[in-house]
Amino acid sequence: MCKARLVAGLLTLVLVTASWMSVSSALAASAADINRDATAALAKLYEKVPEARTLGGKAKGILIFPSIVKAGFVFGAQYGEGVLRQQGKNVGYYNTVAASYGLQAGVQSFGYVLFFMTDSAVAYLAKSDAFEIGLGPSIVVLDQGKAKTLTTTTGQSDIYAFIFDQKGLMAGLGLQGSKISRMEK
């Protein structure tokens, strides 16, 4: 019985991984598409959370992932593409990938923006082959309510993250363990 469960689990993992690889290549967007979607996503975030605009004005870099797709049934994966902006200019393109295992089911899309508040945090991203959220510079995930309490004295973290525009149904959403890698566009 245990062997049957193990084989079924491994088969599921192989199928999910194979499907995810074909989906992620189909999801690959052009630089123009990423730029357009990132501009719209950032404008939407600034409209809903005015405090994010204040952070954006002080940030050394803003990494915008306008749309990330997460899907899973026991095994899960997520993928999205984004752009790093410094002083309003696009300076690099990145993808974010995560895999998970556990009690989960569903499909969801969402976006997130990382505000890099220090030069050292931006440098860490630039020199990393795969920047993993949760390792390296400190990251604070903010929602609309928590953003209202942010001041110049409390805002001392390396990176602030906002998750927004969640659509679909999936239990469990987080950034921990996401790997961010530079890509050519």
Protein language model annotation of sequence segments:
Residues 5-17:
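Sec-dependent N-terminal signal peptides
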Residues 27-185:
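Small-residue-enriched, tightly packed secondary-structure blocks
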